[in-house]
Amino acid sequence: MQTLRQIPSLMGKPQTHVAGEPIVALHNISARYNGRFALQDVSFDLIAGEQVAVVGPNGAGKSTLFKVIAGVLPNSGGTVSVAGSGPGTHICIAYVPQRSQVDWTFPVDVADVVMMGRIGRLGLFRRPKRADWEYVHQSLDVVGMSAFAARQIGELSGGQQQRVFIARALAQEAELMLMDEPLTGLDVRSQDDIFAVLDELRARGVTVMIATHDLNLAAERFDRVMLLNGQLLGFGQPEDVFTPERLVNAYGGHIRMLDTGDGTMIVNDTCCDQ
């Protein structure tokens, strides 16, 4: 499997955004979903090149946040800036949806799914050129899916499908990747495959936001964590964000923090109260 650093066509292009500078800036964002406020008064800056885990209970607004940043869903208040411009104006943003939102029965092969990432650069009615197909196959190689290029997307495992969608984002030449619960339903080996790809994205300087329900994984694997429940409850280092008070505010009384020999483990307590 090639690495991003071994692919000149993916690495030779200079960065559009400067590492260490904000690539995303939200100020007092509010957004509605299904007629109610899903986000209220959310503000933060995201530094180019970092990897951030967004956590919170179901209905916390994680997916809504990603859609607002990507320009898919309009905000009802506040301002969104992506690389200095409004949302929806950049093809450098890739949104990887939840697997449950994708129709995996649609008859399309893996290579064509990845080619969809080139549409923003091609335009809707232009045929892909040889260079575009090179991007497709190189992107599949990066995520270890070259051997599946002709396979129907619905025939793949959950982890393989997620890697194909990451390859689509690579073919798009995305510099900001928004991944909505890509680890949900995956076994440990498939999760490790995803994290290997994330390491390659880090080497390239791609900024990544991932929504996840696994607080321990968020604390162990990411530069910063964001705790969300309609409002921004905390954003920073895990030890500063995952405090008992904030976790209760986010999850109610169903979170327990256990001291272990290796640190603190956060447990979701779903048992009935005695």
Each model region followed by its residue ranges:
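Conserved ABC ATPase "signature" region
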Residues: 115, 130-148
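Conserved ABC transporter NBD signature motif
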Residues: 75-93
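Conserved ABC ATPase signature
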Residues: 152-156, 160
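Helix-to-loop junction immediately C-terminal to a conserved catalytic motif
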Residues: 70
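ABC ATPase nucleotide-binding domains
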Residues: 243-245, 249-274
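Catalytic Walker B motif of ABC-type/P-loop ATPase nucleotide-binding domains
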Residues: 177-181
